[in-house]
Amino acid sequence: MFFIDIPDSKQSAISVGTLTVPGGSPELFKLSVVNNRLGGGMEARLMRTLRLEKGYTYGARSFLRENTFQTPFYAYSQVRSNVTLESLKIFRDIINGYAESYNNQDLEITKNKLIKGNALRFERLASLINMLDTMSKFGYPDTYIQNEQEVLTSIGLDEARSIARLNFNANKMYFVIAGDAKTQLNRIEELGYGKPIILDREGNKIN
């Protein structure tokens, strides 16, 4: 766990992350499908809990940024300073409980959302260029969008839960918090991940 002091800040920026599968891996698309109900929109668990239920933030999301080596998983939000610890606990508990809470409804909602989204996904020139760039960078075949559709329709609940169990473990992730050290630094030790490592704004360790 890392902390960056932003003196007198009224908000805390929270980032949670880890490295996952390499870009170009056939498992990456499956992982992105499973992530959808964790942090892929308004109806996902992070947004629903932190914004709609608790009112701690305007937004909370998680996503995968495909990379040639290992693809980073990120979950993030900006919350009111006085609920920093409470928000961190929500991130931890939602991520750790995601595999067991994931159900058939989650999977079907995700499938319908992504299938419908594909109808409009490549209407813009920029989207087509991005698709070609992705194909070139990761060596995807011309049929990779079709292949993704087939994977999407075939993935089952047991496989989705197995993917979540393998990849979403907050106890093995990095937590980075930027906020007011004076009021929040001691509190967040209650999260159970030990004393935070202090960094400056450039990411250098402060002794």
Regions found by a protein language model. Give the residues of each.
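Second-shell loop/turn segments in exported
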Residues: 17-23, 33-37, 72-82, 95-101, ...
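Buried hydrophobic packing residues in well-ordered domains
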Residues: 16, 31-34, 50, 75, ...
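His/Glu-based metal-binding/catalytic segments typifying zinc-dependent metallopeptidases
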Residues: 1-43, 206-207
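Proteolytic maturation boundary segments
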Residues: 1-5, 157-165, 169-207
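M16/insulysin-pitrilysin zinc metalloprotease superfamily fold
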Residues: 65-121, 189-193, 202-205
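A structural supersecondary motif
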Residues: 15-17, 38-79, 199
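Solvent-exposed coil/turn segments that connect beta secondary-structure elements
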Residues: 7-9, 19-21, 39-40, 63-65, ...
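Short acidic/His-enriched helical or mixed secondary-structure segments at domain edges of catalytic enzymes
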Residues: 1-11, 48-57, 68, 101, ...
